[in-house]
Regions:
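Non-catalytic cap/lid and distal C-terminal segments of serine-dependent acyl enzymes
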Residues: 1-260
Length: 260
């Protein structure tokens, strides 16, 4: 069952659209509510409808019994900017579950039933928010995540003339500030969690071997997680930074959430 909701967000100071897939009467045996729920964050330049209709989300939801909630990411990298009255991280990580649980009581409110994931920019946001709200999310799935957004401050050789530096400066406050930030910098956030004996939610990550945008960063991040002794299935397979690759990996991501 596919639903499109419109609700007022206090964190964003405006109305927002929320797309929801419920594993109910889709031609498969339907689980009994409350449903386990995956909050899934789109990547840069994508929106919720692209995620819902270009990837087999409805099929995966029906097969796994997991509801899927997708907001629009709006190229925000899920960062908070209270000075602009726009707190995209607070919305996606905290307010979105609160809104959907209130409007749809069929969604489970238990931590062990609540997951977060995303693609590219959304993968970065999912990891950041899983660390920021460890009492809310129990598992994380990251598809080709932009885990080192500071890498985007530099112009990419395969994208000549295209620089994301101005956007990253606006969102992250510049590379120096990002590097020192204990929330935006995922390595610092993980080190802080470990130092304070807080759990790093179990995570699954994948990236295509032909992904020149975030592939090297994903390899470095995986090595960092190994160094910190954080278990994380990391799937490297043929593919680029595109919907074709993510389509092929989505079932594995849901299997991880399902505990298989």
């Amino acid at each position: 069952m596919y639903l499109k909701l419109t609700a007022k967000s206090d964190a964003l100071m405006r109305a927002v659209d929320i797309h929801v897939i419920l594993p109910y009467h889709d031609g498969y045996e339907s689980p009994e509510p409350p449903y386990r729920t995956l909050y899934f964050l789109p990547g840069y330049s994508a929106n919720a409808e692209e995620i819902i209709f270009s990837l087999p989300m409805r099929q995966m939801s029906a097969l796994s019994g997991i509801a899927v909630v997708v907001p629009d990411g709006e190229n925000s990298f899920y960062t908070d900017h209270p000075e602009r009255l726009t707190c995209s991280g607070t919305f996606a990580g905290e307010e979105l579950p609160a809104i959907t649980r209130k409007l749809l009581p069929c969604l489970s409110s238990r931590r062990e039933d609540t997951f977060i994931g995303g693609i590219s920019m959304g993968g970065y946001g999912a990891m950041m928010l899983a660390l920021r709200y460890p009492d809310l999310y129990s598992r994380t799935v990251l598809l080709s995540p932009a885990v080192e957004p500071d890498d985007l401050f530099a112009e990419k050789p395969d994208l000549p003339g295209v620089s994301m530096a101005p956007l990253m400066d606006a969102l992250m406050g510049g590379q120096e500030k990002y590097t020192a930030d204990p929330v935006l910098n995922l390595r610092r956030a993980i080190e802080s969690a470990l130092a304070e004996s807080r759990e790093v939610p179990p995570l699954w990550m994948c990236c295509g071997t032909e992904d020149t945008l975030v592939g090297a960063a994903c390899d470095r991040f995986s090595a960092f997680l190994d160094e910190k002794k954080i278990p994380h299935p990391y799937v490297r397979g043929r593919g680029g930074h595109d919907l074709i690759y993510w389509d092929e990996r989505l079932e594995e991501a849901f299997r991880f959430l399902f505990g298989q």
